[in-house]
Swiss-Prot record:
Listed name of the protein: Phosphoinositide-interacting protein
Tissue specificity as recorded in UniProt: Strongly expressed in most dorsal root ganglia (DRG) and trigeminal neurons. Expressed by most peptidergic (CGRP+) and non-peptidergic (IB4+) DRG neurons. Weakly expressed in other parts of the peripheral nervous system (PNS) including sympathetic and enteric neurons. Not expressed in the spinal cord.
Taxonomic lineage from the root: Eukaryota, Metazoa, Chordata, Craniata, Vertebrata
Disulfide bridge partners, by residue number: none
Region Disordered, annotated ranges: 1-21
Transmembrane regions: 54-74, 92-112
């Protein structure tokens, strides 16, 4: 028959087991979860909510204007220059890239607004459920 090993002493534990933290309470699990905590009541500012689409739209608009400038310069200069051919290829590329980023930012804003409304409804129903169940 096999002999079962004795329980390991504290000093004999592997280094990986020393790194693990002991489980504490259910509330600590809620706090460490990836989702936003229901317990936080501080509302986010508009900048915190919309900063990513604003940055994408700003960069897209800058690239779009750069593409417009390059394209205009390419068609104003005479075709004798070798640089003109390169500018005529790069200009429309910047135009399309800038327009794409600008449109992505513009589409992102209504998506965030819809998500915020759903989150508000969800928080309302969670608080209502909490109120009704704890009577």
């Amino acid at each position: 028959m096999e002999v079962l090993p004795k329980a390991l002493e504290v000093d004999e534990r592997s280094p990986e087991s020393k790194d693990l933290l002991p489980s504490q309470t259910a509330s600590s699990l809620c706090i460490s979860s990836r989702s936003e905590s229901v317990w936080t009541t501080t509302p986010k500012s508009n900048w915190e909510i919309y900063h990513k689409p604003i940055i994408i739209m700003s960069v897209g608009a800058a690239i779009l204007l750069f593409g417009v400038a390059i394209t205009c310069v390419a068609y104003i200069l005479e075709e004798k220059h070798k640089v003109v051919q390169v500018l005529r290829m790069i200009g429309p590329a910047f135009l399309s890239l800038g327009l794409m980023m600008l449109v992505c930012g513009l589409v992102w804003v209504p998506i965030i607004k819809k998500k915020q409304k759903q989150r508000q409804k969800s928080n309302f129903f969670q608080s209502l459920k909490f109120f009704l169940l704890n009577r």
